């Protein structure tokens, strides 16, 4: 018996629609990362991108537990001396609600060209509307 390896012709991608309203950020992100990698499919192959496209709506209504809404801090560096920037989860959700989910999911994907290809299949929107109705995304419950 040989190990199954998916070929590009074997991969059939779907578009999934996930509503982030009142979903815990980390639990949502881990489920989405698994779908983007394709680990929920029987034809999963580690060296290939077998995952589906994921559209997340209502990113502004995502929940966090405890007092992370005020206490969780996101850091990044500009590349210049003394250029470390910090923003709290509360301010990030107020200004760019989709970035919190994007950062959480990106941290759960591989750090390689394959991981970057998987990340491109993630579409996050702050509100109810999204421009992917032509792809007919199927509602997916988490």
UniProtKB/Swiss-Prot annotation:
CDD domains attached here? Ribosomal_L13 (cd00392)
Record's keyword annotation contains Lipoprotein: no
Q: Which InterPro entries match?
A: Ribosomal_uL13, Ribosomal_uL13_bac-type, Ribosomal_uL13_CS, Ribosomal_uL13_sf
Q: Which UniProt keywords apply?
A: Ribonucleoprotein, Ribosomal protein
GO MF entries: mRNA binding; structural constituent of ribosome
Q: Which domain of life is it from?
A: Bacteria
User: What task does this protein carry out?
Assistant: This protein is one of the early assembly proteins of the 50S ribosomal subunit, although it is not seen to bind rRNA by itself. It is important during the early stages of 50S assembly.
HAMAP family on file:
Ribosomal_uL13
Q: What family name appears in the similarity comment?
A: Belongs to the universal ribosomal protein uL13 family.
Q: What is this protein called?
A: Large ribosomal subunit protein uL13
Q: Which organism is it from?
A: Francisella philomiragia subsp. philomiragia (strain ATCC 25017 / CCUG 19701 / FSC 153 / O#319-036)
Q: What is the lineage of its organism?
A: Bacteria, Pseudomonadati, Pseudomonadota, Gammaproteobacteria, Thiotrichales
């Amino acid at each position: 018996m040989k190990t199954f390896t998916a070929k590009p012709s074997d991969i059939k991608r779907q578009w999934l629609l996930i509503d982030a309203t009142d979903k815990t950020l980390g639990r949502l992100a881990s489920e989405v990362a698994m779908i983007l990698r394709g680990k929920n499919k029987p034809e999963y192959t580690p060296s290939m991108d077998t995952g589906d496209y994921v559209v997340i709506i209502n990113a502004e209504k995502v929940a966090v537990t405890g007092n992370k809404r005020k206490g969780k801090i996101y850091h990044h560096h500009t590349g210049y001396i003394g250029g470390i920037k910090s923003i709290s989860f509360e301010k990030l959700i107020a200004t760019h609600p989709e970035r919190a989910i994007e950062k959480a999911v990106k941290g759960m994907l591989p750090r390689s060209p394959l991981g970057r290809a998987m990340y491109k299949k993630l579409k996050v929107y702050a509100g109810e509307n999204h421009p992917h109705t032509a792809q007919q995304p199927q509602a997916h419950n988490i």
